[in-house]
Amino acid sequence: KGFGDSCVVGLNEALKTDANIIALTECDGTYSGSDLQKMIPYLDNCEVVLGTRLIQVLIEKENQNGIFNTWGNYFIAKLIQLKYFSIQHMGVVSLTDVGCTFRCIRRDGLEKMIERITNDYDKKIDKNGWLIIPYLNMIAIEKDLKIVEVPITFKKRTGGASKSGAERKSKGL
């Protein structure tokens, strides 16, 4: 059915288990499971840990994130920060990479989000697209969940070409 649908179904299925931590990732070899060791400890202090692919020393050269993805994700991240800005704390969250799928969510955090994810998804989000990922971030913010980004390893895709068309879009620019 599509990437977005897979994410929503996967998150709903995860809540049918007894898992206390839910990790969301892609199966194309771009993310390293060993990064979970960096991410999980943050769940002691927050409900959502997002990966960020913007730390150069952790990024494999010639990966699929071209200028369109890198700067587009960063720009959208800053727009989301402005939307939820709090003058008291210089914002409620600091985001740099809203297109990164790799994340860990505590069960209690996902339970607060899941109804909205499922209901809104059917009405607002393209089932084939990647927009579910930044939308998950926005729902977490709106549900007052604590969110932190952690630098992760990002490797060249091993599972074939992207289905999102971002590479074609960037060439069109």
Predicted regions and their residues:
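Catalytic donor-sugar/metal-binding loop of nucleotide-sugar-dependent glycosyltransferases
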Residues: 134-155
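Acceptor/aglycone-binding surface of glycosyltransferases and processive sugar-polymer synthases
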Residues: 3-16, 21, 33-121, 157-166, ...
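Acidic metal-phosphate-binding loop of nucleotide-sugar-dependent transferases
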Residues: 29-31
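Acidic donor-binding loop at a coil-to-helix junction in glycosyltransferase catalytic cores
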Residues: 124-135
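Residues that recognize and position ribonucleotide moieties
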Residues: 69, 103, 129-130, 148
